[in-house]
Design a protein with these regions (language model features):
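Mature-chain termini and adjacent capping regions
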Residues: 1-171
Length: 171
């Protein structure tokens, strides 16, 4: 009886070690947020003036990662206010902020609307916060209701005031 129990016990012990290795690999590969916030609202101010309001149904904080980021997997809306208190809005079904790189990525049905009737539709948009520059290398539709123009193309970059707009390829 002892001769059967010892090999059986050893087999069970060694079979568990493979499971432990798999579990350790899984926990290393899977990224877990440091925190989650529901019905998230963040108000950015400068000198007691509201500069931007970010809202999202869900914010996942991954500041515990080697390259920290904040994710908005259920959509995001940001309202920006300029010096004259004009409101510009950007919405997307997904957003991610990389604070150490000062880069914001929005994707899935991105719509940027300005107070003066300009509208940009694109599947993906980046904002370089350091340079205050917005760009996409994807297809876009840019509508200027004041001028009555619609521009379609692939790839575009501009400043946040839309005062310097460059379309890479128009279609």
């Amino acid at each position: 009886m002892k001769s059967i129990v010892i090999p059986l016990g050893m087999a069970m012990l060694f079979s568990c070690s493979n499971d432990m290795k798999n579990l350790q690999q899984l926990s290393v590969q899977k990224k877990f947020p440091q925190g989650e916030a529901y019905d998230f609202k963040l108000v950015y101010t400068d000198s007691s003036k509201v500069v931007a309001v970010l809202t999202s149904p869900l914010n996942k904080d991954f500041s515990n990662q080697q390259m920290p980021y904040s994710e908005f997997p259920e959509g995001v809306k940001v309202e920006f206010y300029d010096q004259a208190r004009h409101k510009n809005t950007v919405q997307a079904k997904y957003g991610i902020i990389y604070p150490s790189a000062d880069i914001v990525e929005l994707r899935d049905s991105v719509v940027l609307t300005t107070y003066d009737g300009k509208k940009l539709n694109t599947p993906q948009l980046f904002w370089d916060q350091k340079e205050d520059w917005i760009f996409t290398d994807r297809e876009f539709t840019f509508t200027d209701t004041k001028k009555g123009t619609v521009t379609k193309g692939i790839g575009m970059d501009f400043d946040k005031k839309f005062s310097s707009v460059k379309a890479h390829k128009t279609t």
